[in-house]
Amino acid sequence: MSVAFSIELEQEIDGRWIAEVVELPGVLAYGATQQQAIAQVQALALRVVADRLEHDEAGREYLDITFAAA
């Protein structure tokens, strides 16, 4: 089974970009560019998923992961 994570992007007043993985509450990251914010939040999401797998908090649905920037 595969899981697709949605990434929402928003530009802050100071010019930085914030990216958030909608399906993983609290998983958000800043970047100077959209691409940097996306890369940062993808890396963080993978860490969260790895931690959940390591602690048996996630099922097999995390075996195939896809990211889609909105």
Cite the ranges covered by each PLM segment.
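Short amphipathic alpha-helical segments
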Residues: F5, E23-G26
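Short aromatic-glycine-(Arg/Gly/Cys) micro-motifs in beta-strand/loop hairpins
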Residues: E10-V22
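A short, exposed loop/beta-hairpin motif centered on an aromatic-Gly-Thr core
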Residues: P25-Q36
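ATP/adenylate-binding site constellation spanning eukaryotic-like Ser/Thr protein kinases
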Residues: V21-L24, Q42
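Short, charged, surface-exposed hinge/linker loops at domain edges
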Residues: M1-S6, Q35-A70
